[in-house]
């Protein structure tokens, strides 16, 4: 019985292989390096995901609800939701009640909305009846650190098509450029203002720094309701999961 004892490489690229004959009970040679059994990765699904940040809850305009919702329009309530623990929070189950006692499951949110607050004032802007309200004068600073959110720039066509639509304290604003200025902080420019029928909010008053901000995408929870619920109070509960 023989075993491999060493392997040498020559300068010309050749190799010397040394074998050792084993006699009697000597059948193995101890390895130079030992091995360690692998344990693999076992996720702990019972880790507390923590609570949520204060959600941004609003009623979309008819135009916004009809275009950006799989519900096909109608009366709706939208909510931007994110977790306090941006590492462990995976989403939440949403429950609603009209009497504050009996709750029913309304849906499930997976992943956080890209939400936060503005860091600069957004001035009023005059409506342009002839076309889109393109604001090349003002920019908007936003901080999304509560949700660890990230924004990407688009094109002028994206902004005009409202592909980058955001909720800014009642006004819907789309943007072309998102300049990263710090961790989860951006300056948005080439703004399309007062979209989806929110011209009144655009012209009413300046929106100060600290105004709620949310990127309108698939991360927004949408709850329909019928006209018999107009004026009623709805209570919402958010059950987080990791």
Please tell me what each predicted stretch does:
Residues 1-242:
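Interface-prone segments of viral and bacterial extracellular assemblies
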